[in-house]
């Protein structure tokens, strides 16, 4: 099975950096993507906002320059997470981020 996603866009919420009780570093932010793609031979405007999380000891190096308004390309895998309020969402777990 394959679970790989690449998405470019703009950081639209300030990154939140934290550390788990086990000492694992995390950085969470929201990425907004806008583009035009061709579907059924017609141009279609595409928009999405997706939460992104970067975890692990290398996360600080990858995310230290990410701020509100950064234009980046994120690669990673997608997982479903349920929040404390019971509402679920897809989250992009990034392992590579490039500033564009």
UniProtKB/Swiss-Prot annotation:
Coiled coil: none annotated. It comes from the Bacteria. Residues 1-100 form the SSB domain. Keywords: DNA replication, DNA-binding, Primosome. One of its GO terms (molecular function) is single-stranded DNA binding. One of its GO terms (biological process) is DNA replication, synthesis of primer. Pfam families: SSB_1. GO terms for cellular component: primosome complex. InterPro entries: NA-bd_OB-fold, Primosome_PriB/ssb, Prisomal_replication_PriB. The keyword Repeat does not apply. The keyword Endoplasmic reticulum does not apply. NCBIfam families: PriB_gamma. Involved in the restart of stalled replication forks, which reloads the replicative helicase on sites other than the origin of replication; the PriA-PriB pathway is the major replication restart pathway. During primosome assembly it facilitates complex formation between PriA and DnaT on DNA; stabilizes PriA on DNA. Stimulates the DNA unwinding activity of PriA helicase. Homodimer. Interacts with PriA and DnaT. Component of the replication restart primosome. Primosome assembly occurs via a 'hand-off' mechanism. PriA binds to replication forks, subsequently PriB then DnaT bind; DnaT then displaces ssDNA to generate the helicase loading substrate. HAMAP family: PriB (MF_00720). Belongs to the PriB family. This is Replication restart protein PriB. It comes from Vibrio vulnificus (strain YJ016). The lineage of its organism: Bacteria, Pseudomonadati, Pseudomonadota, Gammaproteobacteria, Vibrionales.
């Amino acid at each position: 099975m394959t679970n790989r996603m690449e998405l470019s866009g703009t950081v639209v919420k300030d990154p939140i950096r934290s550390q788990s009780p086990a000492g694992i570093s995390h950085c969470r932010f929201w990425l907004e993507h806008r583009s035009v793609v061709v579907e059924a031979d017609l141009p279609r405007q595409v928009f999405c906002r997706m939460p992104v999380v970067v975890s692990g000891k290398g996360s600080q190096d990858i995310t230290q320059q990410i701020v509100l308004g950064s234009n980046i390309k994120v690669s990673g895998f997608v997982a479903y997470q349920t929040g404390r309020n019971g509402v679920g969402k897809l989250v992009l777990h990034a392992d590579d981020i490039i500033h564009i």
